[in-house]
Amino acid sequence: HEKEFLSDKAAILSLFGLSVAWFGDNLPPPLRARVLAVQGMIAVGFIAFMLFASNPFARLMPAPADGEGLNPILQDPGLAMHPPMLYLGYVGFSMAFSFAVAALIDGKVDAAWARWVRPWTLAAWIALTLGIGLGSHWAYYTLGWGGWWFWDPVENASLMPWLLGTALLHSAIVVEKRDGLKSWTILLAIMTFAMSLIGTFLVRSGVLTSVHSFAVDPARGLFILGLLVVTIGGSLLLFALRAPALQG
């Protein structure tokens, strides 16, 4: 599960980058180049993590003659779509993050930028909403899982980027319609993706105790923490240096 999780994220990151390359003809070439560069660097980070810390292509030796299979309680159509939708939402917010970093480098946030970033943010928000909803529906009729919402740490880790993504959608509208909240919108774009990475770190590092169970490896947690520090720390430093020029 752990290795599939990483390969799924890397694949989704690559697909989002390809989408911008193929369908981003309406973007100014410098902005599109910077968005693709940021998206590519994030993808490289996850691919490096996958290859060096959790290689999905590593052979299992010795291979079990007869595996145990999936827990029957998890064999549910809705639950089959729950993780992919969450991953699509988490990774989808990387597009808003990439647009935010590109805007900080350009020193320009305007109505056109807001129109470009909103569809990507909305797509990620819808995917995350579906993922949370499918998981909640499954938990409701599964005995002993706590009902619709248990305020479990892993559930809360998915809720935080959803709340920030909701705020980002509304803030982008203000940028587009009133030319205001520019710095706030950029910060929301950064923090929404930051919470996606922080949630991944907390869940996969074993820091949290949860009714959700995952394969835990402290070394992998440290790798994710390093990726988090570089990605989010660098973007927040750039924000501190460039945001004053975006006020308006």
Please identify what each model-predicted range represents.
Residues H1-G248:
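Polytopic transmembrane helical bundles with strong interfacial aromatic enrichment
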